[in-house]
Structures are given as C-alpha cells and as structure tokens.
C-alpha cells in the first residue's frame, strides 16, 4: 500500500483554522461539539509532552485509549507527532488479550517509557492478577511513569500500582473541552508532593479557582464550583 501511494502536498493553513470538531461524552448533559484551533493546539500539546510527561523525541510513549476520545486524539495521534517521538497504537483490552499481562508485554517489547491510561484499566488488571504474577514475567526497566485520567483514580488502585510498578503513578485531570491537562504533577518540570485523591496543582497556563454560590473564593475544605481560566 505504501509503495503504491502517491505523495500529498502540504497545505498552508491559518493557525486559527479548525483542526477538528470532537463531541463530549454527554455525561452531564447534551454532547457539545468542541472546535479545536490548529496553532494553539500544536503549541500546547508539544509543550505537554516534555513538561508534563517528560517525553523526548527519542522516547517511546503509549497512550492506551481510543482515537475517538480526546485522549486518543491528543495523545495517540497529535502530541507524539508534534514531539517527534514514537507512539504505540494498541487495539485490545488490558485483560483477556490474551491475559492480564498484555500491558506489561507491550511495555517490555517496545521499551515504553511512559503509559497514559484510565484507572478502569488498572482496576481490571488488579482484579485479574492482584499479586502481579504476570508483571514479574516481563522486563519493564524502560518504564518510568504511569499517568491516569478520565475518571476518579481511587487510592487503593493507585497504591496497588505504585507498589507493583515502583514508579510514580500520577492522577491528572482534564476534559474534552481543554484537550490537555488542567492539573497534574509535571514530571518534566518538577515533581511535587501530593496526596491520594488529588490531581496535584494547576498546570502552567491555567488559573483554577473554587467559587462559592455568592461568587466569593472558597476557603480550604469548602465546597464550590470549579472555575478555569
């Protein structure tokens, strides 16, 4: 197929033209079509690869997601291309394809430096192989960090992963609307102390506040609405 393919010329685009329209999941309401610009998207995603995920152009990166979701859009396809690193595209599940060692085999075979996936994936692995017997079959010396997002990462799952992998397990938070992390421990800048059930602090470029119903700033341990600028 490649040998018979014809070249496609590059086409100049304005930086503020649309890269894509991707719809939100609709979990809390009607799905919203999110329009992403080209220029800002490129700048932001390339910046995150080094500063949040500590990935260089000669590293192997794996985002175990689906291209139909924002994580797959941003971190299977676009961000690795902008950074120039190798990206792993995996079609399968963390268990049953063929077993609970599927993730470890891929990390070992391709010398993956960092993995980004959903907490559900690790809950499934933990359920099938709580003692980590499959993990011990593979060489994961290349592996340096695990990033979790997409849903709440419960402390039990994070602790299990930390004990098994012996690498930082980082819960970070973002949405389809942003296309990259709002808050995270930035491994390429400086690792910060954090606590379980926390997605650390706002990533550079974001101003995050908790606002009460009277529009005043919430104090520590007070409930309110999240406001992001």
PLM regions with names:
Residues 209-229:
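Conserved beta-loop-beta connector loops within the AMP-binding
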Residues 42-60, 70-114, 127-133:
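Conserved AMP-binding/adenylation subdomain of ANL enzymes
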Residues 85, 113-117, 126-193, 207, ...:
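Gly/Ser/Thr-rich phosphate-binding loop
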